Amino acid sequence: MVESASTMAGELGVSDATVVRTAQALGYGGLPELRRALAGQVEDVTLDERLHHSLARTGNDLLVDAADSLVASLDVLVRHMSGSRFDHAVEILGGADRLLWSGIGPSAPLADYASVLGGRLGRPSLALTRSGPAAADDLLALTPGSAVVVLSYGRLHRHVDALLRHADDLAVPVVLVTDVLEGQLGDRVAETLVCWRGPPGLFASHAPTMVLVEALMMGLARADPGRAESSLAQLEDLRALTGTG
């Protein structure tokens, strides 16, 4: 489901237009709409079914199987990630006074991790990980001059919609990291980075997202190495001061 029309066309030996027309013949407006529909079907798979299907695909060496699955997911990430989009995302984040990382559920620890990395590299950062009514408190953190990275997979959650509305009101740029929401949200964000979490219907792997987050952080460090190195040197001094070096 991650392939673009051009990639799918190349693999099938047909034109891009043929792929789009086929999706339309099935009753969809185009490939993005078909992708969202398929994702919706996958969302209906229960967690226990995901585990069952995942275990059914494993052999005797679970570690090797897990590593092979991760390598395959990272290969998809690298092959389908546009270099210009990645560079644009780094440019957006690099121009912000503060970075906000939004993620709930399993994505919340990734948002926390990204926030820690950002702070260490001299980029003031904050993780927005609350949901429900408490998500409104997180939205208060959005201020002009900041930039938001939204980690959102599968269906569109209400708090993400609210965040995008508030960010638009404040002219705060948003970088969306997602699997299938580009077609639905692409025109509401400054940039979209497609990051797949493994085969649909199986247990999701968040390792590709972590790799992407770390790559974004390295991109920021490369954009301003003096700032990153100065912050890390200060961190070393503070560790010595607190006895944690």
Regions found by a protein language model. Give the residues of each.
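Alpha-helical scaffold segments in soluble metabolic enzymes
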Residues: 21, 33, 37, 73-76, ...
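Short, charged beta->alpha transition segments
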Residues: 84-89, 134-138
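Short amphipathic alpha-helical surface patches that mediate protein-protein
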Residues: 6, 39, 94, 233-237
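Glycine-rich phosphate-binding loops that contact phosphosugars or nucleotide phosphates
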Residues: 94-222
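HTH-adjacent hinge/linker in prokaryotic transcriptional regulators
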Residues: 1-2, 6-85
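Internal, active-site/partner-interface "lid" segment
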Residues: 223-245
